[in-house]
């Protein structure tokens, strides 16, 4: 679910915290990607001409592998060094949200069957996408493919977004990449959205700065997390009557959720008695992650024959296309730099250069004046 309305809050209160870039701007950057979110995207978006998920002759879904292979190729073609992070066990507090998702999926399955009988193809497709979920098999097959491609991955002990954020905070990667805005609640210094979208969508990558966000809001980290909980997250339902603008106003007025829960008008803001905001706050501020210092990210040369065996022989992919993809992967593995120059050299702010310009111009003027021939009287 992410954080409801957070992108709108940032756009309204601190627009300088987000910028939009082309993928080429991230040449040489290491990025930790939320694998579960990516696989979910692939299962929904990577479809055949009939609108159905891609399958092999055995009836096995292959949309997730097609997406993982070609979207990863697009990244390495542009000089990025991706690593994927997979979800571990969900926190107990998330069980309610997971139960709601399961209920929605069951309802969508029933509506899809009904649409098959009386509805249009568009209706069937709409409800079919709502039934999508990432299974253990999808995860295992994605990990196998990444290993064959030489792309590192990490198994998070709990939430993948939290582990991505931890890797970014430790400097192991430049940014965390996910469509879920709650990645910012885990204090990822930089969040990239739309990184794993297809090239055909021509969607620029949105880069969110955590530091500029809390500076623009004039919030502490704790206040920002409280704001996100108030907006509505996977761990806590939102409070009826509290939208993005009102949530910002309430945190500024009360300072934190403790004061809001204690002092708020309960008729105006019906807060459930068992609203677990303190547990949610703890999950964001003290997330269960593997220590970044214990994680070594290594990008290796691809196992060309292994990829052919897995994708072509086992999963029924077109061999010619896979071989072209392998060639792109091999080329990228030889040309992607170890690091960017701007990570080694300190870039001076442009303001200093601007200040120096008038002085330099004045000096040139004096030099020109002194060297000019004097007029005879």
UniProtKB/Swiss-Prot annotation:
Positions of the UniProt region annotated as Interaction with PCNA: 337-345
Residues bound to Mg(2+) 1: 34, 87, 159, 161
Organism: Schizosaccharomyces japonicus (strain yFS275 / FY16936) (Fission yeast)
Binding site for Mg(2+) 2: 180, 182, 234
Classification via Gene3D superfamilies: 5' to 3' exonuclease, C-terminal subdomain, 5'-nuclease
CDD domains: H3TH_FEN1-Euk, PIN_FEN1
UniProt PTM comment: Phosphorylated. Phosphorylation upon DNA damage induces relocalization to the nuclear plasma.
SMART domains hit by this protein: HhH2, XPGI, XPGN
PANTHER family from the UniProt entry: FLAP ENDONUCLEASE 1 (PTHR11081:SF9), FLAP ENDONUCLEASE FAMILY MEMBER (PTHR11081)
InterPro entries reported in the protein's UniProt record: 5-3_exonuclease_C_sf, Flap_endonuc, HhH2, PIN-like_dom_sf, XPG-I_dom, XPG/Rad2, XPG_CS, XPG_DNA_repair_N
Function: Structure-specific nuclease with 5'-flap endonuclease and 5'-3' exonuclease activities involved in DNA replication and repair. During DNA replication, cleaves the 5'-overhanging flap structure that is generated by displacement synthesis when DNA polymerase encounters the 5'-end of a downstream Okazaki fragment. It enters the flap from the 5'-end and then tracks to cleave the flap base, leaving a nick for ligation. Also involved in the long patch base excision repair (LP-BER) pathway, by cleaving within the apurinic/apyrimidinic (AP) site-terminated flap.
Record region (I-domain): 123-254
Family the entry assigns: Belongs to the XPG/RAD2 endonuclease family. FEN1 subfamily.
EC number annotated for this UniProt entry: 3.1.-.-
Keyword entries, A-Z: DNA damage, DNA repair, DNA replication, Endonuclease, Exonuclease, Hydrolase, Magnesium, Metal-binding, Mitochondrion, Nuclease, Nucleus, Phosphoprotein
N-domain as annotated region, ranges: 1-105
Gene field: rad2
Origin: domain of life: Eukaryota
Organism lineage: Eukaryota, Fungi, Dikarya, Ascomycota, Taphrinomycotina
Positions of the UniProt region annotated as Disordered: 96-115, 350-377
Residue ranges, compositional bias (Basic residues): 360-377
Localisation per UniProt entry: Nucleus, Nucleolus; Nucleus, Nucleoplasm; Mitochondrion
Protein name: Flap endonuclease 1
Biological process according to GO: base-excision repair; DNA replication, removal of RNA primer; mitochondrial DNA metabolic process; UV-damage excision repair
